[in-house]
UniProtKB/Swiss-Prot annotation:
Plays a role in transcriptional regulation. Involved in activated KRAS-mediated transcriptional activation of PRKD1 in colorectal cancer (CRC) cells. Binds to the PRKD1 promoter in colorectal cancer (CRC) cells. Could play a role in the terminal differentiation of the intestine. Binds preferentially to methylated DNA. Belongs to the Caudal homeobox family. Pfam families: Caudal_act (PF04731), Homeodomain (PF00046). Residues 196-207 are annotated as: Interaction with 5-mCpG DNA. Residues 73-92, 110-126 have a biased composition (Low complexity). GO terms for cellular component: nucleus. SMART domains: HOX (SM00389). Transmembrane segments: none annotated. The keyword RNA-binding does not apply. Residues 157-178 are annotated as: Interaction with DNA. This is Homeobox protein CDX-1. Residues 30-43, 93-108 have a biased composition (Pro residues). It is found in: Nucleus.
Length: 265
C-alpha cells in the first residue's frame, strides 16, 4: 500500500502515469479471465470432477518372447501328445497314475515260525561267496582234531635250510662269528635267502655254540668234595647212668615183683 501511495503522487522524477498497468491488483493485470469450469463428469461425486479419465487399454498385448524356431522342432521332434481325458475320469475317481497298490499278503504261521536267516531267506551274492564266520571256522579246524591247539602264523614257522645253504653258512661262521653287513648281503644273494634269515641263523648259531661250550666246561670239571663248613658234628647222647649214677645199682638188681590180683565178690 505504501508503494502505491508513493507512485500515485505527482513527482517530476516519474513522468507520465506512475502506476504501470502490470502492477494493478485487478483482474485485468492477469490477462483475460479463465473460462468457466466444465460440468462434472460424475454428478453424484462432485469432488472427483477434476480427475482425468483413465486412458483406454491397448487393443492387444505384444508377445513377450519370439516364436519358437523351426530348427528346434526338427532336431528334437514333436513332443508327446497329452492323452485326452474323458469326462467320466475327470468327474469322479482317482487318476490312472495313482492307482491303489495292492497290499502284500500277511505272513502265515509257517513264516512266523521260521527264524531269521533260514533257508527260505534270500541271501546276497557276497554272503553266498563267503560265510560271515569263515575265519573263525578256520581257526577252530586248525586247533582241533589231534593238533596241539597253538595257532602259528606264516612268519613264525622255522625256515628249513638245504644242505648246501647250511654248508656255506657254516664255512662263513668258521671264519667269523659276527658277519658284516656287506658279506651278509652277498651271502644272502648267493644262497637265495634274505638278509634277515642270514642274520637269524648266525644268532642261533652263536647261541648254540655258547650252550655247547658251557656243557663241555661242566663235564671237564671234577666234582668238588664237601668243605669243612658243610660237615657238622653231631653231639653224642649221654648214657642213662651218667644222668643218675646212684640209681644204676637199683636198675641192675631190681626184679619184677609178683602182683596179686584180687577180685571182690
Amino acid at each position: 500500500m505504501y508503494v502505491g501511495y508513493v507512485l500515485d503522487k505527482d513527482s517530476p522524477v516519474y513522468p507520465g502515469p506512475a502506476r504501470p498497468a502490470s502492477l494493478g491488483l485487478g483482474p485485468q493485470a492477469y490477462g483475460p479471465p479463465a473460462p468457466p469450469p466444465a460440468p462434472p463428469q460424475y454428478p453424484d461425486f462432485p469432488s472427483y470432477s477434476h480427475v482425468e479419465p483413465a486412458p483406454a487399454p491397448p487393443t492387444a498385448w505384444g508377445a513377450p518372447f519370439p516364436a519358437p524356431k523351426d530348427d528346434w522342432a526338427a532336431a528334437y521332434g514333436p513332443g508327446p501328445a497329452a492323452p485326452a481325458a474323458s469326462p467320466a475320469s475327470l468327474a469322479f475317481g482317482p487318476p490312472p497314475d495313482f492307482s491303489p497298490v495292492p497290499a502284500p499278503p500277511g505272513p502265515g504261521p509257517g513264516l512266523l515260525a521260521q527264524p531269521l536267516g533260514g533257508p527260505g531267506t534270500p541271501s546276497s551274492p557276497g554272503a553266498q561267496r563267503r560265510t560271515p564266520y569263515e575265519w573263525m571256522r578256520r581257526s577252530v579246524a586248525a586247533g582241533g582234531g589231534g593238533v596241539s591247539g597253538k595257532t602259528r602264523t606264516k612268519d613264525k614257522y622255522r625256515v628249513v635250510y638245504t644242505d648246501h645253504q647250511r654248508l656255506e653258512l657254516e664255512k662263513e661262521f668258521h671264519y667269523s662269528r659276527y658277519i658284516t653287513i656287506r658279506r651278509k648281503s652277498e651271502l644272502a644273494a648267493n644262497l637265495g635267502l634274505t638278509e634277515r634269515q642270514v642274520k637269524i641263523w648266525f644268532q642261533n648259531r652263536r647261541a648254540k655254540e655258547r650252550k655247547v661250550n658251557k656243557k663241555k666246561q661242566q663235564q671237564q670239571q671234577p666234582p668238588q668234595p664237601p668243605t669243612a663248613h658243610d660237615i657238622t658234628a653231631t653231639p653224642a647222647r649221654p648214657s642213662l647212668g651218667g644222668l643218675c649214677p646212684s640209681n644204676t645199682s637199683l636198675l641192675a638188681t631190681s626184679s619184677p615183683m609178683p602182683v596179686k590180683e584180687e577180685f571182690l565178690p
